[in-house]
Curated annotation (Swiss-Prot):
Its EC number is 1.3.1.98. The gene is murB. It is found in: Cytoplasm. Residues 26-189 form the FAD-binding PCMH-type domain. This is UDP-N-acetylenolpyruvoylglucosamine reductase. Pfam families: FAD_binding_4 (PF01565), MurB_C (PF02873). Pathway: Cell wall biogenesis; peptidoglycan biosynthesis.
Length: 295
């Protein structure tokens, strides 16, 4: 019996192979991929379906399992990729805008404080969800307000940064959300000064991370008072492989699809590293990469 879906203005795609979309080039089929036309379209879908809903962004920090994703997978499209200057060093960005584009836009507006975002792959929505950060700064320190739709009731909410209850690489909101828009605040600075800082960050990233490989950013969060890469290295896991998956030799908190890996290859290798670190140091590493889909 065919599935009955709400009549939306956006686009439904069916049986979408996620390995064609994700940065790691792994993942089975998503039953239904939905790109809403606007916020009202998204809300209408959520309020009028009983199917499970998942959310993806740029998929730059994600493993989609080989079994794929059941139900509806929502991905915000170009309609949500806007970035615009407001006033007084404030910038509004849609949930699908890239963090790196926000950093460059801020530079053009002579707004400093957002430079760290240039080295973080992913979207505004994903960055808000995980409190993305680098080089001593994070989203929580520069975001002012956030608009989000709740995946349970389909209602639109607005939160201040304080109300988000931000913690290291996460927030304290209950339930599941899709982040639609955010306002960011920086400070005035010269364009050339900001441009120099952007170049510094990119150069540092290129030297220290496997930017040309199929990767999904840092595998694990840094435990309190420790650096994950040092624990991984100290456990002898640098360069470790499993099937087509490998721990990067350049930066060992990065997981690589170097030879047609499956999602299972990658996830199993990550768990092997976790177990090895636990045995060696009695410290439990927590995934920073999001794993989506059923076993």
């Amino acid at each position: 019996m065919p599935i009955s879906l709400p009549k939306v203005r956006g686009i439904y795609r069916y049986s979408v192979l996620m390995s064609k979309i994700t940065w790691l080039n792994v993942g089975g089929q998503a039953d239904i991929l939905f790109k809403p036309r606007d916020i009202e379209d998204l809300i209408y879908l959520i309020k009028n379906t009983k199917l499970p809903i998942s959310v993806i962004g740029a998929t730059s920090n994600m493993i989609v399992r080989d079994s794929g994703i059941r139900g509806i997978t929502v991905k915000l499209g170009k309609e949500f990729a806007y970035i615009k200057y407001k006033s007084n060093n404030s910038i509004i960005a849609g949930g699908a805008a890239l963090l790196s584009n926000l950093a460059y836009f801020a530079g053009e507006q002579q707004v400093s404080g957002l430079e760290f975002l240039v080295g973080i792959p992913g979207t505004i929505g994903g960055g808000i969800e995980m409190n993305a950060g680098a080089y001593g700064s994070d989203v929580a320190s520069v975001v002012q307000s956030i608009k989000a739709v709740n995946l349970s009731d389909g209602n639109l909410y607005e939160f201040s940064s304080k109300e988000m209850g931000y913690v290291y690489r996460g927030h304290s909101l209950k339930g599941q959300w899709i982040f639609i828009e955010a306002e960011f605040k920086g400070v005035s600075s010269g364009h050339e000064v900001i441009l120099h800082r952007l170049k510094e960050i990119i150069n540092k990233k290129n030297k220290s991370q496997p930017v040309r490989g199929k990767t999904a950013g840092c595998i694990f969060k840094n435990p309190r008072a420790y650096q994950a890469w040092k624990l991984i290295d100290g456990s002898g896991c640098r360069g470790l492989n499993n099937g087509g998956a490998k721990i990067s030799k350049k930066h060992c908190n990065f997981l690589l699809n170097y030879n047609n890996a499956t999602a299972s290859d990658l996830e199993n290798l990550g768990n092997k590293v976790r177990n090895t670190v636990k045995d060696k140091f009695n410290i439990e590493l927590e995934w920073e990469i999001r794993v989506l889909g059923s076993h």
